[in-house]
Amino acid sequence: TQPDISALVEGHTDNMKVFNLGQIKDNWDLSVMRATQIVKLLLNSATIDAKRITASGRGEFFPLDPSNSDAAKKKNRRTEIILTPKLDELYQMLNEK
């Protein structure tokens, strides 16, 4: 456990529109649900403090590959985990050196 690090789990989608798949109304819903599933997996399988992890959705608005090919769409359907240190502690560490 790293008490000085938080995690942001971002869900992303491709640019194909989602049309009312039950709870999933659009790519925003899909991306949030994608991130939430990863957060639940992490919380169930690791000793992570739930207060230090956040799920968010980015929809189709941050593609890794903006082309419209099948390979690009596959690449854009993803989840990213971004680790963030406490900035005040990081700043202090940098100033000590």
Residue ranges and their predicted role:
Residues 97:
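Short, cationic low-complexity segments
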Residues 1-2, 12-94:
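Periplasmic OmpA-like peptidoglycan-binding domain that tethers envelope proteins to the cell wall
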